[in-house]
Amino acid sequence: AINYLPKGGFFKLTCQAFEAGLAEESLFRFAMLGVLFYAWRNVKQRLPLALLTSSILFGFAHLINLGGQRADLTFYQIGVAFLLGLFLAVVYVYTGQLWLTMLMHFSLDWFSFLATGTTKLTGDLVPGDWWALLILFVIFGGFSVWMMFGTRRKVMERHVKRLTGEHQHFGYSIQY
């Protein structure tokens, strides 16, 4: 049972997780990637460049947490956010489904917030935390690199064209 949360805490943490999933995915996956894909439409490697750039910006957006948690925890969070942002960006571009990354982001934050009872990182970093970050780097980084080749890359390139309006199909025509 979640009886360690203050009164109204479950609802508040659920709303905060929902806001993060909805707002951050709309901003960094939908808007930011759309702008970067369009801005770099003539750059041959725009796909990996946009994915990395949006993920770096997503990580740095967590600098705002310096106002409510220690610097070392915030910089650790930036690393995790960068890697998660890269994974979510790849999922979004591969599937073309923003709702999926919103759900994934909400779920991750929701379970984390409920498990700790807060939206902030607390405690002290231990060597295991840094090992976990390295493991995330290998998993999410390796997955992202793997997605850049073969049919997976072609699917993402096709979705980029659709997401940026370069390859729209409306399914109708006007005949006179």
Short names for language-model regions:
Residues 1, 55-64, 106-118:
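Aromatic-anchored segments of alpha-helical transmembrane domains
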Residues 2-11, 40-45:
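Helix-boundary and loop/linker segments of multi-pass membrane transporters
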Residues 10, 63-79:
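Interfacial helix-loop-helix junctions of multi-pass membrane proteins
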Residues 14, 18, 22, 52-56, ...:
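Residue-level signature of the transmembrane alpha-helical core
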Residues 23-53, 70, 90-97:
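Membrane-interface helix/loop boundary segments of multi-pass membrane proteins
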Residues 48, 52-55, 93-107, 163, ...:
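Functional transmembrane helices that form membrane-embedded active or gating regions
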Residues 73-130:
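Functionally important transmembrane alpha-helices
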Residues 106-176:
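C-terminal membrane module of polytopic membrane proteins
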